[in-house]
Structure formats: structure tokens, C-alpha cells
Curated annotation (Swiss-Prot):
Superkingdom of this protein's organism: Eukaryota
Function: May function as sodium-coupled metabolite transporter across the chloroplast envelope.
Protein name: Probable sodium/metabolite cotransporter BASS1, chloroplastic
Cross-referenced PANTHER family: P3 PROTEIN-RELATED, SODIUM-BILE ACID COTRANSPORTER
Gene from which the chain derives: BASS1
Keyword terms: Chloroplast, Membrane, Plastid, Transit peptide, Transmembrane, Transmembrane helix, Transport
Transit peptide: 1-70
Annotated family: Belongs to the bile acid:sodium symporter (BASS) (TC 2.A.28) family.
Membrane protein topology class: Multi-pass membrane protein
Keyword Transcription: no
Length: 401
């Protein structure tokens, strides 16, 4: 049979040739089932006529349909979907694990509370290595284009940076005073408030229909500047509770934050194939690291948490709720659009709590100081996910348009 085959509709429609089907972009879902008794074939004209009263819907023109004439194959046979490669499956599993971030962190903390011995193998050196790998993975998501993008939205970026290092540190300080927290818990809560934005905020921003590009830029900006801001603000606000080694905090932040982020950005710029190969496994590694570190911090102080844990949970919830609330309100007051205001709210409300765990473990003598940091990781993950679910139901106007 010749390759040019035409379909004639006997209700007066113009015959459609095989190449015109491509132009019309027909799709199998729009074609009705063709009965063999309704087909007629003329050898002289090499034409197949369809005795049907149906017309081709207008919607067919919007979808592509590749018509391949083969004997014994009906018009309703659809091409089989291409199987996913191993790399695609790894990426799919990684995304699923990352999306369930609050669940894994909650399980890690619950395991540390109920069975503290589970995390006896974790050492302070391991916590540094784990956080370094996490920050390296974050750096691999950055490029020079991201840095150029910061120049196109200076207002949003500056507002986010200002709110990040004003709303959260001050909220932590006032919540500590309001609840009259013990010195070690107050210092830990202030440390959390002075930490940069958390990497999980990028995922939550995406779910909330926020400005993901701005989220990445804000996380990067607050993380890099944390080398100065975190030790400075912590020493200023927490000195009345405990002795703070500002220089030690600065060196640790430089080691586990700035250098890995810059190294990751360098790899992404000049070794793209390597980054493309390892990037699918970095998010689940980061999630696992955070869950283990939080479980370790909880396990180290399980008995104390069982006695006064409610107070720490309440303090952490109030801290992050104030971050989400004031981050959004002040952004809107400054005239920032809804999508970017959602992003700033999430960035301000979600902290890099695991950095607080590492810094508290390394530089504060009382291990209870790390407890608010670990509890904070669970609280902001759950609160942020709930907020994202609410916002996802109402898309910002610029996204709807």
C-alpha cells in the first residue's frame, strides 16, 4: 500500500491525507473507534473511506497525532510509554524523599527521643562532614546566572536579607523572655534565630507557588553572609545567657558553610557533567543528614526533653510562626508582589537549624543548647509544609495570568 493514504468522511468533510494529519495535530484520544465493517478500500484510488456520521472535533487541531498505517493495527492503538532509565528512577526517588522532608526529620527526632542509643555512632566530626556535604550540594545548584539574577530583583533580595537577620533574631530573643526559658534553651533558640535560611525552603517555596529563583538567591545570600551575621548576632543577643565564642563560631561557619557552597558553585560552573551525575542523589543525602543530626541532638538530651520538652516545642513554634507572619506582612507593606512575598515569608520562617545543631555542639558547653535547634528543624518543616499546602490552593495573580 502506498505511503500516502487518505481518510474520507462521507458527511461531506474534505478527505484528510496522512501528511495533513500531522498539520491538524490529531490525537488518538479524539478519534472514535472504527469498525472494520465500516471501512471500504478502493485499489484504484488507494483510498480508505469511513462510513460514519461523526466529524473530527475542533480540539483535535491542538494535539499532535502521528498516523502510521500498519496492517492489523486499529486506530485506537496507542504507542507504549517509554520506560524510565536508571538515572530517571534515581531522580524520581530523590524528589519523593525530598518532598517528604518533614516526615524523615520527625522520625529521626522521634527515634532519638525513644531510642537514644540509635545515634551513639554519631560523633561531632561526623556532624561537620554531614553538614559540609549538604552545603556542597546546595552550592551545586548555583551558577553565575543566579548571581546575575540577583541584580534584576535587588529590592526583594535586600528586603529578604534584612527581614532574615532582624525578624528571626529579635523574635527568638523576645520569645525567650516571654516564656522565661532556662539559659541553655534561650541561647539555643537565639542561635536558631541567627542562622541563615534553610535549604528545605526552596522545596517549600516551589510547593507554595512562590518565586523559586528568589528563594535560591535568598538562601545563598543569607548562607554566605552567615559567616559574619550568625556569630555577630548570637554573641550580641545570647551573651547574657552563656559565654559565646564569636571567633570560633565564625571559623566554623566559614568551614561548614561558605567554603562548601563556593566549591559547589565552582563545580557547577566548570564540571557540569560531574554535577549532573551526582546532583540527583544530593537532596536525599541532605535530608538523611538533617534527620540524623536532629535525632542525634534529641538523643543526647532525651531525658531532659521528656521533662521540659513542651516548653521548647512551644518556643520553637512561636519563633517560626512569627517568622512566617512578619516576613509576609512586611514584604507586602514594602510593595513586593504576592509570589515574592510568599518566598520571603518562607525564607524568613525556615532556618538552617542543622547549622545551629553543629555550632551548639562544637562551641557551647551545655549539650542542652542544641535541643532547640533540633526541635526547630521539625517545627519549621511541619509549619512550612502546612503553609505551602494552604498557599498552593490559591495561585498568585501573576502566575494565573
Amino acid at each position: 500500500m502506498a505511503s500516502a493514504i487518505s481518510l474520507s468522511l462521507l458527511n461531506g468533510a474534505t478527505p484528510l491525507k496522512s501528511n495533513s494529519l500531522h498539520k491538524s495535530r490529531l490525537t488518538p484520544l479524539h478519534l472514535r473507534t472504527i469498525s472494520c465493517s465500516r471501512l471500504s478500500y478502493s485499489p484504484s484510488s488507494r483510498e480508505i473511506s469511513l462510513k460514519t456520521q461523526s466529524t473530527v472535533p475542533i480540539s483535535c487541531r491542538r494535539s499532535r497525532f502521528d498516523f502510521v498505517p500498519r496492517c492489523g493495527i486499529s486506530s485506537n492503538d496507542l504507542p507504549t510509554e517509554k520506560k524510565k532509565s536508571f538515572g530517571e528512577w534515581v531522580e524520581f526517588v530523590g524528589e519523593a524523599v525530598s518532598t517528604a522532608f518533614p516526615i524523615w526529620v520527625s522520625l529521626g527526632c522521634l527515634l532519638g527521643l525513644m531510642r537514644p542509643s540509635t545515634f551513639n555512632w554519631v560523633t561531632p566530626n561526623w556532624t561537620i562532614v554531614g553538614l559540609t556535604i549538604t552545603m556542597l550540594g546546595m552550592g551545586m545548584t548555583l551558577t553565575l546566572d543566579d548571581l546575575r539574577g540577583a541584580l534584576s530583583m535587588p529590592k526583594e533580595l535586600f528586603a529578604g536579607f534584612l527581614l532574615q537577620y532582624s525578624v528571626m533574631p529579635l523574635s527568638a530573643f523576645f520569645v525567650s523572655k516571654l516564656l522565661n526559658l532556662p539559659p541553655h534553651y534561650a541561647a539555643g533558640l537565639i542561635l536558631v534565630g541567627c542562622c541563615p535560611g534553610g535549604t528545605a525552603s526552596n522545596i517549600v517555596t516551589y510547593i507554595a507557588r512562590g518565586n523559586v529563583a528568589l528563594s535560591v538567591l535568598m538562601t545563598a545570600a543569607s548562607t554566605v553572609s552567615a559567616v559574619i551575621m550568625t556569630p555577630l548576632l548570637t554573641a550580641k543577643l545570647a551573651k547574657q545567657y552563656i559565654t559565646v565564642d564569636a571567633l570560633g563560631l565564625l571559623m566554623s561557619t566559614l568551614q561548614v558553610v561558605l567554603l562548601p557552597v563556593l566549591a559547589g558553585a565552582f563545580l557547577n560552573q566548570y564540571f557540569k557533567k560531574l554535577v549532573k551525575f551526582v546532583s540527583p542523589v544530593m537532596p536525599p543525602i541532605a535530608v538523611g543528614t538533617v534527620a540524623i543530626l536532629c535525632g542525634y541532638a534529641i538523643g543526647q538530651n532525651a531525658s531532659a526533653i521528656l521533662m521540659s520538652g513542651k516548653q521548647v516545642v512551644l518556643a520553637s513554634c512561636l519563633l517560626h510562626i512569627s517568622g512566617f507572619l512578619f516576613g509576609y506582612l512586611f514584604s507586602r507593606i514594602l510593595g513586593i508582589d504576592v509570589a515574592s512575598s510568599r518566598t520571603i515569608s518562607i525564607e524568613v520562617g525556615m532556618q538552617n537549624s542543622v547549622l545551629g545543631v553543629v555550632l551548639a555542639t562544637q562551641h557551647f558547653g551545655n549539650p542542652l543548647t542544641a535541643v532547640p535547634c533540633a526541635v526547630s528543624s521539625v517545627c519549621h518543616s511541619i509549619l512550612g509544609s502546612v503553609l505551602a499546602g494552604i498557599w498552593r490552593r490559591s495561585a498568585p495573580k501573576q502566575l494565573e495570568d
